[in-house]
């Protein structure tokens, strides 16, 4: 039976770089992100370049009902997933009290709740299969508070500590849990979070490929 690596946030940045790195190693992939057109183009390109099977699913992980539907599709499809890469994430910047609450809620849904739910659903599947791997993408932001990005920094601290705890819990099931904590990386994140990109350009940013 074909084994798949499932990658969220796979349409750009670190998620895309990890997808390419895994395809280069011959891994079959399931790519998840919001942008269907981008995913389709990426799937075609990776298949042509590396000769691997690449499936994709457009899904907004910030919407619990859509995530439920996606998880049901995975269960009914009976595809064996032995690697989960939780790379989807978002950020906001500015005074917390000035933020739009729905945007803050979306951040919590994507960065915390969707990641946790995917770990629970696919972790159970991996345990039944006899093992697997989970990679959760956090950030160096996980190690310190972040005024004017308080929710984002807190969400990454959650990912770090959740992953560290889960690593101990799932060790006996043959499941390896790792957490990636990259520094500032040249992705679309900063623009989406409405950060001062001119200031960031003066810093030494890593490329997504270097992180992957």
What are these regions (language model features)?
Residues 25-42:
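Conserved glycine-rich Rossmann-like NAD(P)H-binding loop of the short-chain dehydrogenase/reductase
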Residues 11-13:
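Conserved glycine-rich cofactor-binding loop
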Residues 119, 155:
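Active-site helix of classical SDR
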Residues 95-108:
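Substrate-binding pocket helix/loop in short-chain dehydrogenase/reductase
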Residues 87-92:
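Conserved NAD(P)H cofactor-binding loop of Rossmann-fold oxidoreductase domains
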